[in-house]
C-alpha cells in the first residue's frame, strides 16, 4: 500500500501553492493529488476534472447516499467530498495520495484511515494571515473576518496533527513538507523550534 497524506490549513495560508510545489518535485513522482467533488461554483482559471469535479447539490447528495466518499463536509455553505474508490485504487498500486482538505475532512479521513499522515499549515501570525487574505482581493471584509475567526478555531484543532508546518518562508516550508513526507528523519530540530514558537504565538 502507498501512503495517504492529508494537508489542511486556514484559508490564505499558502497551502495550495505548497502542494503544487511539492508535487512538481521529482521526489513526489509517485504521489498523486486527490481531486474532490464540490458543489461550489468554479473560480476563474479553475477547470472541471482538474481543480475539482464541479457538481450540483442533488448529484452530490446522490453520491453521499451511495457511500461514494471517503469523507465529505460542508464548508462556507458548499459541500466537498473525496472519492473513495479512486484513493483506494491508487494506494493499492503502492503509490501515494495527497489530499488537500479542510479540517473537518482531514479529521474524518484520519478516523477512517488511522495510518494517514496529517499535516497542518499555519501562518507566522494572524496579522500576516489578514494581509494575505486582503491581498487576494477575492473576499469582502465580512468574509475575511469570518475566515480569521475560523482560522483561530482550526489552529486549536490542527495543533494536534501529525506535523505542523509554518509558512513563514515559502522555500523553508516546502523543505519541511518534503522532509516530513519523504524522509525518515522528518523536519529538522531548528525548524521544529520555529514551528513550535509560531504555534505558541497563535495559541496565545
Question: What are these regions, as identified by a protein language model?
Answer:
Residues 9-11:
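The conserved Walker
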Residues 16:
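Walker A/P-loop
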Residues 24-33:
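Post-Walker A helix-loop "phosphate-sensing" segment adjacent to the P-loop in P-loop NTPases
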Residues 36-97, 104-107:
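ATP-dependent small-molecule kinase phosphotransfer cores
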Residues 97-102, 111-135, 166-169:
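Conserved phosphate-donor/acceptor-positioning beta-strand/loop module used by diverse small-molecule
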Residues 138-139, 156-204:
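NTP-dependent small-molecule kinase module
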Amino acid at each position: 500500500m502507498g501512503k495517504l497524506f492529508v494537508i489542511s490549513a486556514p484559508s490564505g495560508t499558502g497551502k495550495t501553492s505548497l502542494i503544487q510545489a511539492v508535487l512538481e518535485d521529482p521526489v513526489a513522482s509517485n504521489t498523486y493529488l486527490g481531486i474532490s467533488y464540490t458543489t461550489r461554483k468554479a473560480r476563474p482559471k479553475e477547470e472541471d476534472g482538474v481543480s475539482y469535479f464541479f457538481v450540483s447539490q442533488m448529484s452530490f447528495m446522490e453520491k453521499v447516499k451511495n457511500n461514494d466518499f471517503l469523507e465529505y463536509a460542508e464548508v462556507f455553505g458548499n459541500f466537498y467530498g473525496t472519492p473513495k474508490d479512486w484513493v483506494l485504487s491508487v494506494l493499492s498500486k503502492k503509490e501515494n495520495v495527497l489530499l488537500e482538505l479542510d479540517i473537518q475532512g482531514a479529521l474524518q479521513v484520519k478516523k477512517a484511515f488511522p495510518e494517514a499522515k496529517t499535516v497542518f499549515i499555519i501562518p507566522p501570525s494572524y496579522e500576516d494571515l489578514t494581509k494575505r487574505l486582503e491581498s487576494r482581493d477575492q473576499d469582502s471584509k465580512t468574509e475575511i473576518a469570518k475566515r480569521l475567526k475560523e482560522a483561530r478555531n482550526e489552529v486549536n484543532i490542527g495543533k494536534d496533527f501529525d506535523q505542523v508546518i509554518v509558512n513563514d518562508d515559502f522555500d523553508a516550508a516546502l523543505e519541511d513538507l518534503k522532509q516530513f513526507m519523504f524522509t525518515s528523519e522528518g523536519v529538522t530540530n531548528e525548524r521544529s523550534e520555529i514551528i513550535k514558537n509560531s504555534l505558541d504565538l497563535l495559541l496565545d
